[in-house]
Amino acid sequence: AMAISSVLLLGAARFLPALQRDSLTSTRKLALEDEIWLRVFTVAKHLQRAGYCHGSCTGEGLEIVGQGDCVIVQWDANSNGIWDREPVKESDQIGFRLKEHVLETLRGATSCEGKGWDKVTNPDAIIIDTFQVVRQDVSGFSPVLTVNMRAASKSEPQTVVNASYSVTGFNL
């Protein structure tokens, strides 16, 4: 009985650290997935609103720049019939871009260049490899806008998450 107990105890002593390590790895991957999906859904919600105007707005509701790694969205948030540019804090434009493996945003964005962009992801924890918005136009229908994002954990680069989400641009 003592020998059997010793064998079981040694087996458990070997198994427990591996179980804890796998549990920690799974928890980190889930946290990374949650973070990336939250960002993808946020961008997609803005894309879905792009072009909305309760009046006669001028300009394009959506501007996809470069390879889709920067987008500028306009929509009439206060339904006053125009796309407000001033004051910047209440501007109807918002931009998202990938710069140096960080997703950034700027309220009142007019181009994808310049300073003043706020980091949306933490560069000390997450490396964004890919951020891309793709527009697919289908004759007779509203365009389909797809947000693609690929990210890795900075502490564990082998932990990678891919996310892709599509919305319809009804106002475009």
Model-found features: residue ranges?
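Aliphatic-rich helix starts adjacent to a transmembrane/signal segment
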Residues: 1-48
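Short, hydrophobic secondary-structure boundary micro-motifs
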Residues: 8, 55-56
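Generic detector of ordered secondary-structure context
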Residues: 34-35, 88, 159
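Type IV pilin-like appendage domain
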Residues: 60-138
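Short linear sequence signals and composition-biased patches located at protein termini or domain-edge surfaces
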Residues: 114-172
